[in-house]
Regions:
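Short, acidic, small-residue-rich periplasmic hinge/interaction motif at the N-terminus
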Residues: 49, 53-56, 92, 98-141, ...
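Outer membrane beta-barrel strand-and-loop segments of large Gram-negative receptors
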Residues: 491-493, 546-550, 556, 640, ...
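Surface-exposed extracellular loop regions of Gram-negative outer-membrane beta-barrel proteins
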Residues: 410, 458, 523-525, 603-647, ...
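Structural signature of Gram-negative outer-membrane beta-barrels, strongest in the C-terminal barrel
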Residues: 489-491, 503-507, 513, 546-670, ...
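Periplasmic N-terminal accessory/gating domains of Gram-negative outer-membrane beta-barrel systems
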Residues: 172-174, 202-267, 273-306, 317, ...
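Short, acidic Ser/Thr/Gly-rich low-complexity loop/linker segments typical of extracellular
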Residues: 143-154
Length: 801
């Protein structure tokens, strides 16, 4: 053997090894495209590697530093191997590389983990009755993020994947905690149990970055439990009386339920019953409100920085939500008070699916006074309210609510001196409201509510006089006079609202609506008849010149986003668009809403806001208390919409456990406000209401201080308001065109409310109110005008000043 032959041996060996390696590489290159079919659920990396190694000829090589953050869930059907690896390692800090029959796994360097986020959503309800809880607080302990339930008890919060701890709290309920690993979108419904030991509740609107209302200022949430514990006249718990005790809110006349908020008039308050406006909220000339306490679940008051979803009034929004009804068991209450009696019944129609809630109230002043009435004079007054609601749960995604309210005041006076002369009158006024609402959850981030409603307010007066006498010739003459006056407003509305949580940093609300108005401002009919021995001498019907109805159409749209900038600043930016069409006239308004909240530290917060509002309806009133003669009228070609610009700034301190301190200042500029002209009266004038009023402007400013104790056996609040409200009308008009104090301008106001709980059954409360007097203009002259006998308004007397 030659040496040369030995030299060729390594060469042949290398060639052979190379051919084998090349063949092997080609073989495994083909295996890359091997199609796999398998199903994995919550598998570990080790389990995944074993599956691939058994299904292919590859082996994995990786160090201890390589690991997966998420369990592997994958269903593959004829999927190439490289696509399987791409899918599994897409959101992991792992890279892979083929090397012959090996798959090398390496840790990605210099890259931050891709944090997946999932959404938790659901309803928060009472554990006993399944009643939804509005404004329940939800906070995540690790991320320090939170939210609140919306007006239908629904919440949605998006959090990073991993260990999660949610705390659910609500006034009067034991705090619920849920701990779990968040690895997917989760539906989590919470049933909270009542807690008679009213421990402190986490109010995240001031202490955490959560919820749309947290950014707004001038908002107060009042649970029904707080309203029932607030002292009131004659022991009747009343929604409006409780609101009167808040800073910035004035009462018209002592004891009445009228509201004058931050220098505004009563018609500038948007009062909603389950989302439907209520035009008359008073009984007994303002000493009671129309809201039966047993029917109410929660009340929210907005004095400034109104959310974009609200519009149509200048001064405030009062959102009253009623009870849905117990889905688990039947129960009820019956109570007898000094002036009223009430009954409330609720329970399941289909257990766990459908419930009802019915309440009724009636006064019995007429029954108490009847024994003391003289035989020839009869007076009667009473009022009543009826609420009914049906709540049906189609599924966790879909719910339907049907609501109805009817309330009325009735007054009658009859005189029957003898058989020849009789006269009398009766008045009735009240509301009828019917609404249907449908909640639907499109997904865990998008919630919708659709509302269709009917609303009617009517004031009706009937008077009559019968006079019968005999002539000297023996003829019997009968004179009869009767009249009917009525005014009112009827609304048909459609509204759809959406609640969207795209990311943890954004909470978006948007929607649109249509409202049809029918106004009857001033309708009078009079009938005069004369008979002689049953022979008709005259039978004439008169109508005033203002019997025409006014139809109006209102279209609205809005959008708002509550979002976070950095760790301290949160903004709420919104826009409300409204279009009002009446008498061939269009009024278009763009109303920006801006609110900001800056967290100086964990205890101190500063808020600021700007709000523009427009109002297309007016309430004409000449009395200091709520009267049925108050007239609702729309804007017209002559009467322009009211508008306002409000600026507010506030500071809040929550550093003392169980206490909250706040100070808020505001300035509001108002245009096109209405007042009756000097010397005019509502009754007895043949001219239309447009000729009785004049437009002007107003301004109000004030500062409000409040200290509130929210925890412990003794709770309550102390508030002080310093405010000023002025009006100015055209030169030559009211006060000769000079600025003058508004009739409900009260410079100083102090409210103190205290409640102490001795035990589960015994508690005591007290309230004290101090305010400076209002302003009033005293008439200097009185004139009596008697209409001609053959006039259209025969029988009316007009008293002017």
């Amino acid at each position: 053997m030659k040496i040369i032959s030995q030299d060729y041996l390594p060469v042949r060996t290398f060639i052979l090894i190379g051919m084998v390696l090349l063949t092997t590489t080609q073989t495994y290159a083909q295996n890359i495209n091997t199609r796999l079919s398998f199903t994995l659920k919550n598998a570990t990396l080790k389990e995944f590697v074993k599956l691939i190694e058994n299904s292919t000829g590859y082996s994995f090589i990786y160090g201890e530093e390589v690991g997966i953050r998420h369990k592997i869930t994958l269903k593959a059907k004829e999927m190439p191997l490289h696509e399987v690896l791409d899918t599994v390692f897409k959101d992991e800090l792992i890279s892979y590389q083929f090397s012959g029959r090996y798959i090398l796994l390496k840790e990605k360097k210099g890259q931050k983990p891709v944090s997946r986020k999932f959404t938790i959503s659901g309803y928060v309800t009472d554990g006993t009755s399944s009643e939804t809880l509005i404004g329940s607080n939800i906070i995540e302990s690790h991320q320090h993020q939170g939210t609140t339930t919306n007006p239908y008890g629904f919440y949605s919060i998006t959090l990073p994947e991993g260990e999660t701890e949610l705390r659910f709290s609500y006034l009067g309920y034991a705090t619920e905690t849920r701990k779990f690993t968040l690895s997917k979108d989760t539906l989590l419904n919470i049933r909270m149990q009542g807690n008679t030991q009213l421990e402190e509740v986490i109010i995240i609107s001031d202490k955490a970055e959560a919820g749309a209302i947290a950014t707004q200022m001038g908002a107060v949430e009042i649970p029904m439990a707080q309203i029932k514990n607030t002292p009131s006249i004659l022991g009747e718990a009343d929604v409006m009386k409780t609101i009167q005790l808040m800073p910035g809110v004035q009462a018209g006349v002592d004891g009445s339920a009228g509201l004058y908020i931050r220098g505004g008039s009563p018609d500038q308050n948007l009062i909603l019953l389950d989302g439907t406006p209520v035009y008359n909220v008073d009984h007994l000339f303002g000493f009671f409100s129309v809201f039966t306490p047993e029917a109410v679940k929660k009340v929210t008051l907005f004095k400034s920085s109104f959310p974009a979803r609200f519009g149509g009034r200048l001064s405030s929004v009062i959102d009253v939500r009623t009870n849905d009804g117990d889905m688990q068991k039947y129960h009820g209450t019956f109570s007898i008070g000094l002036l009223t009696s009430k009954i409330n019944l609720e329970g399941p129609i289909i257990k766990g699916k459908t419930s009802f809630n019915i309440s009724a109230r009636r006064s019995y002043l007429d029954l108490l006074a009847k024994p003391f009435m003289p035989d020839d004079e009869k007076y009667s007054y009473y009022f009543y309210d009826m609420n009914a609601k049906i709540n049906h749960k189609f599924s966790d995604r879909s719910r339907m609510f049907l609501s109805a309210y009817h309330g009325k005041d009735h007054f009658a006076a009859d005189y029957d001196g003898n058989t020849d002369f009789k006269d009398g009158s009766n008045m009735g006024w009240g509301n009828t409201i019917v609404s249907a609402r449908w909640n639907y959850i499109f997904n865990n981030r998008l919630f919708s509510n659709t509302t269709v409603s009917y609303n009617n307010y009517l004031f009706d007066v009937n008077t009559y006089t019968n006079n019968q006498y005999s002539t000297g010739a023996g003829a019997i003459i009968l004179n009869r006079y009767s009249s009917n006056y009525h005014s009112g407003i009827t609304d048909w509305s459609y509204q759809i609202d959406f609640d969207y949580n795209p990311t943890p940093a954004h909470h978006i609300k948007f929607g649109t609506g249509y409202l049809f108005h029918r106004f009857q401002p001033d309708v009078t009919t009079s009938v005069i008849s004369d008979k002689t021995d049953n022979r008709i001498d005259r039978d004439t019907t008169y109508h005033n010149a203002n019997n025409s109805r006014i139809h109006a159409h209102e279209v609205t749209a809005y959008a708002e986003d509550n979002f976070k900038i950095g760790s301290r600043l949160r903004l709420n930016l919104g826009l409300h668009l409204s279009l009002f069409h009446v008498q061939d006239q269009n009024y278009l308004s763009l109303q920006p809403r801006i609110s900001a909240r800056y967290q100086l530290n964990k205890d101190i917060t500063i808020k600021a806001s700007y709000t523009k509002m427009n109002q297309y309806v007016h309430l004409l009133s000449s009395m200091p208390i709520a009267m049925p003669t108050d007239l609702w009228v729309p804007v017209t070609k002559k009467i322009k919409p009211m508008r306002s610009h409000q600026y507010a700034l506030g500071g809040y301190y929550t550093g003392i456990n169980g206490w909250e301190f706040s100070v808020e200042g505001y300035y509001k500029d108002m245009r096109n406000v209405l007042e009756y002209k000097d010397g005019v009266s509502f009754f007895g004038s043949s001219s239309g209401w447009e000729n009785k009023v004049e437009m002007g402007k107003g301004r109000s400013a004030g500062i409000e201080f409040m200290a509130q104790k929210t925890a412990g056996k003794t709770t309550g609040w102390l508030s002080y308001t310093l405010s000023k409200s002025d009006r100015k009308f055209t030169k030559g008009g009211i006060n000769n065109g000079e600025w003058f104090p508004y009739k409900y301008d009260r410079r100083h106001s102090i409210n103190l409310t205290i409640n102490h709980k001795f035990s589960d059954r015994i508690d005591i409360g007290a309230s004290w109110v101090f305010y400076t007097g209002g302003t009033s203009t005293i008439p200097e002259e009185k004139t009596t005008v008697i209409r001609p006998h053959n006039g259209a308004n025969n029988g009316f007397l007009w008293y002017g000043t």
